[in-house]
Design a protein with these regions (language model features):
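Surface-exposed, interaction-prone regions used to assemble/regulate multi-protein complexes
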Residues: 1-94
């Protein structure tokens, strides 16, 4: 059974990709900062479109193969596929 989900961040202002780990630096409102980390990333499509005015990111769970998430902004869409769940961490420096 597939499970859809959706959650919001105002915008992704930066990201890092080290090996199989993708970390998104997000700003919600004026003062709230979040890091959203994805581990064991299999595929990342549209990497150039991650930073920008992201209005939401959403996706679905594939039993046995993991998660596919889509990041939508005003011009193009990026997506990431990972077999593991992600982690949201409040705050970041900078």
């Amino acid at each position: 059974m597939y499970r859809d989900f959706q959650f919001y961040d105002s915008r992704i202002v930066d990201y890092t990709r080290i090996g199989e780990t993708l970390t998104l630096f997000c700003v919600y409102g004026i003062h709230e900062k979040w890091r959203t980390c994805f581990y064991r990333v299999k595929y990342l499509v549209g990497e150039d479109f991650l930073v920008g005015s992201v209005i939401s990111f959403f996706g679905y769970e594939n039993p046995g193969s993991g998660y596919t998430l889509f990041f939508r902004n005003s011009s193009r869409t990026a997506s990431v596929v990972t077999p593991e769940h992600w982690r949201r961490i409040q705050g970041w420096e900078g």
